[in-house]
UniProtKB/Swiss-Prot annotation:
Organismal lineage: Bacteria, Pseudomonadati, Pseudomonadota, Gammaproteobacteria, Oceanospirillales
Protein name per UniProt: Phosphoribosyl-ATP pyrophosphatase
GO biological process assignments: L-histidine biosynthetic process
CDD domains attached to this UniProt entry: NTP-PPase_HisIE_like
Membership in a protein family: Belongs to the PRA-PH family.
Gene name of the record: hisE
Length: 110
């Protein structure tokens, strides 16, 4: 999975410099962070609704599709802020051996 995130991160970085008329990602970057955040919020809502539907009807296709959209737009946001996907992977790896309760408690100390 890390390979696809690395590849996608590279493509997203390249698209920051592309013509906004030729690339969806470039057009998001050109419109700025607020537009990107709007898309992240929209995809988050769609993911939540798909999950609720999946619980009712047992179909996971839309949850997978909407989660992919959410991850994609989150990666665009990170790219816009010059944060590489590897930085998120490192943070997840750091948390892997920490219980959720310990991690949550440590946030209050920062």
């Amino acid at each position: 999975m890390n390979d696809i995130l690395t590849q996608l991160g590279k493509v997203l970085e390249e698209r920051k410099l592309a013509d906004p008329d030729s690339s969806y990602v470039a057009s998001l970057h050109a419109k700025g962070l607020n537009k990107i955040l709007e898309k992240v919020g929209e995809e988050c809502t769609e993911t939540i609704l798909a999950a609720k539907d999946a619980e009712q009807d047992g179909s996971t296709h839309n949850v997978i599709y909407e989660t992919a959209d959410l991850w994609f737009h989150s990666l665009v946001m990170l790219s816009h802020l010059n944060i590489a996907p590897q930085e998120i992977m490192q943070e997840l790896a750091r948390r892997f051996d920490i219980s959720g309760l310990e991690e949550k408690a440590s946030r209050g100390k920062k």
